[in-house]
């Protein structure tokens, strides 16, 4: 799988911004991606060393439009820990 297909987008929230102090970065990833694939993709795209990958499956939320009910899509979240001294500049200033 192409690294750019595995990593969909960075997740920039207040909670994730606080994790950056501990060298942890959050991404939305492909639902079928494994931890080794996510690690390789991050290392290739951002030229950093990854020490740990934690993943979680996020369930879609119930949404309403008038009388109709539906769910947003389920997705997968990855929290990546980088080696000491490595940074991802994409997140700086967020």
Curated annotation (Swiss-Prot):
The keyword Ribosomal protein applies. HAMAP family: Ribosomal_uL23_B. PANTHER family: 60S RIBOSOMAL PROTEIN L23A. The gene is rplW. Part of the 50S ribosomal subunit. Contacts protein L29, and trigger factor when it is bound to the ribosome. One of its GO terms (molecular function) is rRNA binding. It comes from the Bacteria. It holds the Pfam family Ribosomal_L23. The lineage of its organism: Bacteria, Bacillati, Chloroflexota, Chloroflexia, Chloroflexales. This is Large ribosomal subunit protein uL23. SUPFAM superfamilies: Ribosomal proteins S24e, L23 and L15e. The keyword RNA-binding applies. Belongs to the universal ribosomal protein uL23 family. One of its GO terms (cellular component) is ribonucleoprotein complex. One of the early assembly proteins it binds 23S rRNA. One of the proteins that surrounds the polypeptide exit tunnel on the outside of the ribosome. Forms the main docking site for trigger factor binding to the ribosome. Keywords: Ribonucleoprotein, Ribosomal protein, RNA-binding, rRNA-binding. GO terms for biological process: translation.
């Amino acid at each position: 799988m192409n690294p750019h297909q595995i990593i969909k987008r960075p997740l920039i929230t207040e909670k994730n911004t606080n994790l950056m102090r501990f060298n942890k970065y959050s991404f939305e990833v492909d639902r079928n991606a494994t931890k080794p694939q996510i690690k390789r993709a991050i290392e290739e795209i951002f030229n950093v060393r990854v020490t740990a990958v934690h993943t979680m499956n996020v369930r879609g939320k119930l949404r309403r439009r008038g009388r109709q009910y539906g769910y947003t899509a389920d997705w997968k979240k990855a929290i990546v820990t980088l080696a000491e001294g490595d940074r991802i500049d994409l997140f700086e200033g967020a």
